[in-house]
């Protein structure tokens, strides 16, 4: 049994967003965004790879889009280097658009520069997401890059007929509580003999989306997911 630790799926805010999509609260999704302004801690082993953000950070956001909405038809990605990251790399800052057959567009900005927050300027760091549906709106803040990193994520949502936004809260946070979910899905699969919630076959589609993003950035064109995942 092979289960994959795509742990952003188990962030409490991301799970709540999925619930609103599944139960129809916000209706058909029209536009979704993830906006990351964060400064990752790159590991020494990454310095020899020539890449950083798409395979380390963006993969979580692409997988979250897949978790929320399923597989897109294509992706367009644009990247540039991060001025703060001194070792050779191509994808320091990334932006990409996932195009769905329904017309839905899922857009992400993964900004690892965030302005000179480490060089003397005040910091404005955070990860925000937003889903606009035909019947409602949901938006959230991911606590991972806050100080402390155990800050709980948040969600705020409202639908047609509501007089105000709803803002449920919880004490858990992505780190470390989301990892309970990824470990539990493996244990459930071992107990039942069923495919894990995030199995290897499913994760290949996320990996294909990342590879399609690299190809898109290299060739300056939209890349069909079917070009990579056959």
Predicted features, each with a name:
Residues 3, 8-88, 94-97, 220:
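Predominantly a Rossmann-like dinucleotide-binding segment in NAD(P)-dependent oxidoreductases
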Residues 4, 29, 75, 108, ...:
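Short, hydrophobic secondary-structure boundary micro-motifs
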Residues 44-48, 120, 169-170:
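Short acidic, glycine/proline-rich loop/turn micro-motifs
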Residues 56, 60-147, 180-193, 228-230:
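Contiguous beta-strand/loop segments that form the cofactor/metal-binding neighborhood of enzyme cores
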Residues 107-110, 138-142, 158, 162-174:
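Short amphipathic beta-strand/extended segments with alternating polar/hydrophobic composition
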Residues 129, 145-163:
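Short polybasic amphipathic segments
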Residues 150, 185-230:
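C-terminal helix-rich "cap/oligomerization" subdomain common to oxidoreductases
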Residues 171-183:
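Active-site loop of classical SDR/Rossmann-like NAD(P)-dependent oxidoreductases
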């Amino acid at each position: 049994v092979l289960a994959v630790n795509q742990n952003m799926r188990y962030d409490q805010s991301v799970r709540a967003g999925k619930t609103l999509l599944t139960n129809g609260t916000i209706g058909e999704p029209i536009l979704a965004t993830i906006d990351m302004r964060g400064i990752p801690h790159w590991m020494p082993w990454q310095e020899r790879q020539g890449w950083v953000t798409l395979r380390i950070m963006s993969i979580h956001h692409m997988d979250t889009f897949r978790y929320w909405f399923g597989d897109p038809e294509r992706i367009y990605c644009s990247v540039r280097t991060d001025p703060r990251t001194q070792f050779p790399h191509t994808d320091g800052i990334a932006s990409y658009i996932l195009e769905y057959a329904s017309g839905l567009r899922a857009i992400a900005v993964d900004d690892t520069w965030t302005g000179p927050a480490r060089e003397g300027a005040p910091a404005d760091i955070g990860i925000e997401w937003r889903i606009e549906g035909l019947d409602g709106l949901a938006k959230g803040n991911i606590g991972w890059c806050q100080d402390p990193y155990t800050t709980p994520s948040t969600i705020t949502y409202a639908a047609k007929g509501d007089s105000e936004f709803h803002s449920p809260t919880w004490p858990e946070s992505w780190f470390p509580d989301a990892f309970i979910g990824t470990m539990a899905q493996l244990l459930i699969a071992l107990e039942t003999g069923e495919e894990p919630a995030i199995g290897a076959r499913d994760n290949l589609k996320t990996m294909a989306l990342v590879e399609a993003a690299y190809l898109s950035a290299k060739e300056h064109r939209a890349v069909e997911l079917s070009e990579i995942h056959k």
